[in-house]
């Protein structure tokens, strides 16, 4: 565990001139680099939101121990295989997405003797990450109040579906339905659509990362632990951003519009090129639109000269643009648009997008490839161990406690 008393840093400048036991700072032409080499984390979380936070800290150099129940076969996503997937022991493709760099401890928390192992770990831990619904952590004896008694400096971060006072089970798809996201996703007049990734889980994970980092900074200042909690429903509502503001400020209720944007045009529209590719435009200002018209040789733009006019006359504008864009080959047009700083891109498959990424954005080991959780530049990119088999590190972890 880290000793906050060694921390002597001016938090307002955060220039990295002081050596802090729980952070190592050093100067660089890029922003100050931070390694959390001595942070110890106990992960009592499963599925995606909580484990994504654990992997984030592992990528920063923290030691992350993932506690899993042998009764359930560990994290449920170990069994979430796509059709035709054979899996690798107790590791599925889904499980690998957020579990790199962790050690797996398979114990039954309902068993007093086995739960005592977690209590020993907590005494020297900095952070606990949990994803229990309301009341479950207390039943298992791993709630914040219980663990704080063992370690007053402990920071406890919990993901819930609906908050601490609502025992309803929260899954990403349900939250998408209840938060308004599905109502504005999909084509106009069609059935609501769920997003094809668990975006609410991802957003909640980011919210918890931020909360835990703030709690760590506070602890450097006052030496106190802290309980922080993020509900999936809250993370979803906060992510409505401009769509939420359209209602709160303008009383304009958001509705599904397909790819279209309620406030900007042409923004999100797809157009077919001469070679059959789909090109998306995301024009954000009048200068970009004028550049687009010059490239496409559109001279009569009187009814489209401002963004508000383009939003009002969207259908007429799209007809004009479609007739021009279909005359161009996709790569030639895209290159021209990029050169003239007109935001545009070709629709790309997931496979194509991943194949185009540079290798340093990936985690690789033993023939396995994964996506990094932390992608900001200016920091060391650490190599991580592959996602663990269930209970792979039991003996190592228990031996270290003796």
Which sequence ranges carry the predicted segments?
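Short hydrophobic targeting helices and cationic amphipathic motifs
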Residues: 4, 15, 19-27
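N-terminal helix-loop segment corresponding to the beta1-alpha1 unit
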Residues: 13, 32-221, 389, 393-402
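Acyl-CoA thioester-binding alpha/beta core of soluble enzymes
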Residues: 32-73, 124, 131, 150, ...
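Residue-level detector of beta-strand structural context in well-folded domains
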Residues: 94-96, 228, 269
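Substrate-binding/catalytic subdomain of NAD(P)-dependent oxidoreductase enzymes
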Residues: 216-255
């Amino acid at each position: 565990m880290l000793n906050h008393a060694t921390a002597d840093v001016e938090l307002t400048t955060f220039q990295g001139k002081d050596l802090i036991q729980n952070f190592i700072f050093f100067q660089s032409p890029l922003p100050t680099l931070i390694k959390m080499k001595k942070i110890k984390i106990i992960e009592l979380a499963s599925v995606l939101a909580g484990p994504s936070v654990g992997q984030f800290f592992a990528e920063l150099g923290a030691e992350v121990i993932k506690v899993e129940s042998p009764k359930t076969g560990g994290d449920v996503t170990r069994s979430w295989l796509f059709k035709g997937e054979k899996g690798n022991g107790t590791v599925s493709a889904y499980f690998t997405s957020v579990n790199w760099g962790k050690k797996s401890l398979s114990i039954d928390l309902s068993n007093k003797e086995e739960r005592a192992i977690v209590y020993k770990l907590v005494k020297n831990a900095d952070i606990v990450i949990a994803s229990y619904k309301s009341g479950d952590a207390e039943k298992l004896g791993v709630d914040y109040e219980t663990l704080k008694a063992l370690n007053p400096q402990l920071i406890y971060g919990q993901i819930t579906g609906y908050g601490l006072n609502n025992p309803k089970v929260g899954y990403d798809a349900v939250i998408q339905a209840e938060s308004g996201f599905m109502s504005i996703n999909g084509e106009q007049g069609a059935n609501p659509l769920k997003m094809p990734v668990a975006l609410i889980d991802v957003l909640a994970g980011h919210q918890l990362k931020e909360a835990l980092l703030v709690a760590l900074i506070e602890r450097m200042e006052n030496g106190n632990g802290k309980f922080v909690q993020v509900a999936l429903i809250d993370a979803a509502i906060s992510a409505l951003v401009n769509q939420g503001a359209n209602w709160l400020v303008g009383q304009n209720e958001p509705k599904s519009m397909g790819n279209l944007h309620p406030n900007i045009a042409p923004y999100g529209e797809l157009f077919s090129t001469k070679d059959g590719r789909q090109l998306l435009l995301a024009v954000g200002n009048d200068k970009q639109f004028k550049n687009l018209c010059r490239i496409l040789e559109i001279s009569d733009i009187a009814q489209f000269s401002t963004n508000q006019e383009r939003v009002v006359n969207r259908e007429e504008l799209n007809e004009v643009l479609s007739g021009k864009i279909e005359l161009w080959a996709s790569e030639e047009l895209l290159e021209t648009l990029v050169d003239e700083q007109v935001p545009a891109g070709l629709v790309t498959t997931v496979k194509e997008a991943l194949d185009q990424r540079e290798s340093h954005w990936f985690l690789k080991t033993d023939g396995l490839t994964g996506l990094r959780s932390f992608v900001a530049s200016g920091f060391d990119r650490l190599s991580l161990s592959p996602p663990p088999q269930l209970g792979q590190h039991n003996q190592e972890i228990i031996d270290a406690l003796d």
